[in-house]
């Protein structure tokens, strides 16, 4: 009995060792995660009015690579949304001349604006759109390695001289402005789509100001 007690006692430090080690590792990991999150709070985009805003906790255990991947996606979606807003407004006020599809007897002037256009585009036209998007994804929208997320100037930048002439502070300000505009555009194009589906009146500001317009 005595020998059994001695055996258990001698094993006890070994049993405590891994537990103590794991606790230290967890503490270190938590500190590391907290420090990483604090570094994200000073990144471009963590700005007024929301500051650092991560309601889904996507950055809780993220490293720098994960953050830059998310930022890359955000920048790209923001640019697409800004183009979508510009396209929506352009299509509302002007149309290309001529035919969109001779086989379908469909002119550009006959095309509705907004989401409704998807139901009118011939299959061949949709195939061209998706093919072009695929080409951009695979061959054009490639981030310059070692540069900031969203730098797609692999094929050269015609504005390189003016960009390089800017100070680091000015470049950071320009990138922050683009992020804010992209975020606003994502909310804007979503609002246009929602209001189009609700009552076919997407331009809420026009409605508030009493400015009439014909949509589709």
UniProtKB/Swiss-Prot annotation:
Listed GO MF terms: chlorophyll binding
Gene3D superfamilies recorded: Chlorophyll a/b binding protein domain
Chief location: plastid
Extent of the transit peptide: 1-38
Any GO BP annotation: photosynthesis, light harvesting
Localization annotation: Plastid, Chloroplast thylakoid membrane
Induction note: Levels are increased twofold when transferred from high intensity to low intensity blue or white light.
InterPro entries according to UniProt: Chloro_AB-bd_pln (IPR001344), Chloroa_b-bind (IPR022796)
Keywords in alphabetical order: Chlorophyll, Chloroplast, Chromophore, Light-harvesting polypeptide, Membrane, Photosynthesis, Photosystem II, Plastid, Thylakoid, Transit peptide, Transmembrane, Transmembrane helix
Annotated TM spans: 80-100, 121-141, 182-202
GO cellular component, one term: light-harvesting complex
Membrane topology value: Multi-pass membrane protein
Keyword Membrane: yes
Signal peptide limits: none
Assembly and binders: The LHC complex of chromophytic algae is composed of fucoxanthin, chlorophyll A and C bound non-covalently by fucoxanthin chlorophyll proteins (FCPs). The ratio of pigments in this LHC is; fucoxanthin: chlorophyll C: chlorophyll A; (0.6-1): (0.1-0.3): (1).
Physiological role: The light-harvesting complex (LHC) functions as a light receptor, it captures and delivers excitation energy to photosystems with which it is closely associated. Energy is transferred from the carotenoid and chlorophyll C (or B) to chlorophyll A and the photosynthetic reaction centers where it is used to synthesize ATP and reducing power.
Family, per entry: Belongs to the fucoxanthin chlorophyll protein family.
Protein name, UniProt field: Fucoxanthin-chlorophyll a-c binding protein C, chloroplastic
Source taxonomy: Eukaryota, Sar, Stramenopiles, Ochrophyta, PX clade
């Amino acid at each position: 009995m005595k020998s059994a007690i001695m055996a258990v006692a001698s094993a006890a430090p070994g049993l405590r060792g891994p537990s103590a080690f794991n606790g230290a590792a967890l503490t270190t990991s938590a500190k590391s995660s907290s420090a990483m999150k604090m570094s994200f709070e000073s990144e471009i985009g963590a700005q007024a009015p929301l500051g650092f805003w991560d309601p889904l906790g996507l950055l809780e255990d993220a490293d720098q690579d994960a953050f830059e991947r998310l930022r890359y996606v955000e920048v790209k979606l923001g640019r697409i949304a800004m183009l979508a807003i510009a396209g929506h407004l352009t299509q509302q006020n002007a149309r290309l001349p001529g035919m969109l599809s001779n086989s379908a007897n469909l002119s550009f002037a006959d095309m509705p604006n907004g989401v409704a256009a998807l139901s009118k585009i011939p299959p061949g036209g949709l195939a061209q759109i998706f093919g072009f998007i695929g080409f951009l994804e695979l061959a054009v929208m490639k981030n310059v390695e070692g540069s900031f997320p969203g730098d797609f100037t692999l094929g050269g930048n015609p504005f390189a001289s003016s960009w390089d002439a800017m100070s680091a502070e000015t470049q950071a300000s320009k990138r922050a402005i683009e992020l804010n505009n992209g975020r606003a555009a994502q909310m804007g194009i979503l609002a246009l789509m929602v209001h189009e589906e609700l009552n076919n009146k997407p331009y809420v500001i026009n409605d508030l100001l009493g400015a009439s317009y014909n949509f589709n």
